[in-house]
């Protein structure tokens, strides 16, 4: 007996889109993407008690209708008392400080705010067109910078709105206890603005796909997409 699985076809992921453009993705597009991703993560947490644990540009999908979706739940996990208790894989480049170096080594738990950090790193990368730790050659260098240096921010000189800069700054609050959860993010001015603002993501997406070439796939993955195992 044959078994057929019908799956929705999406156009591409934000990672490949960035490579196609070879530069920043406009704030208005990222605004709509951010609204969709925060709502998706909030839904996972509230309705299913699940933390994604691998938020990054390659797991954010877009299509010609302008729809944005979150994918790859291979390492997502159940929350127990709102905490992740299980060991999981993830990408070092997008990993929150509290996952790298738990405040209490005897209780290396973390919550959905770890995904908020990952979202912040992803937004910096997509908004600037450059991975914030691109000069690092190893995962260890990335982890060291995450722990020892100030979080990356959106460069004011690139003309980002104050709301966008503030949103990313909130997501990349180093102390996870002060980092907002999804309910607070949904109240942020940046989210409120792009919930209602009319943005033609579909036309922008189709234009980009029509005038750019598909990025070549090499034999290996960039260093910040290598799996890194931790709690």
Where are the model-predicted features located?
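Regulatory extensions flanking the kinase catalytic core
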Residues: 181-216
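Catalytic-loop of the protein kinase fold
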Residues: 45-62
